[in-house]
């Protein structure tokens, strides 16, 4: 039996907007993020879901709740869907013009993710 799986990223947060690493820091959706989730929900309104999986982070849960709407669909919260932890670098800017991350080896996260320098207290891809 065939199964369709939809992978949907959470809506925008203030940290997304300002190019700050958020990882596992629990930042909520901003107004734009809520609007994006509502537009996604509208686009998926006729798609039947058996269940919806989400990380426990508030931005992901809120996005999932908006997409679910009033459908009687189970919302399964699982730690396995959390984002990678950036450790001490969470909250720092990764925008090239305003880069505030102390180790240049971390830049590989965006260019060559398998070889980036793991931040202090953070996770590598191998940890996941």
Which role does the model predict for each range below?
Residues 1-6:
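Extreme N-terminal starter segment of soluble prokaryotic enzymes
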């Amino acid at each position: 039996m065939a199964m369709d799986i939809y992978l949907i990223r959470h809506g925008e947060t203030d940290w997304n907007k300002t190019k700050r690493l958020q990882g596992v820091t629990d930042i909520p959706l901003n107004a734009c993020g809520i609007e994006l989730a509502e537009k996604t929900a509208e686009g998926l309104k006729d798609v039947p879901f058996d269940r919806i999986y989400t990380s426990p982070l508030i931005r992901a849960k809120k996005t999932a709740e908006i997409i679910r709407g009033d459908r009687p669909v189970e919302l399964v919260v699982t730690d396995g869907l959390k984002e990678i932890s950036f450790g001490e670098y969470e909250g720092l800017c990764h925008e090239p013009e305003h880069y505030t991350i102390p180790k240049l080896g971390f830049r590989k996260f965006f260019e060559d993710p398998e070889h980036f320098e793991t931040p202090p207290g953070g996770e590598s891809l191998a940890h996941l």
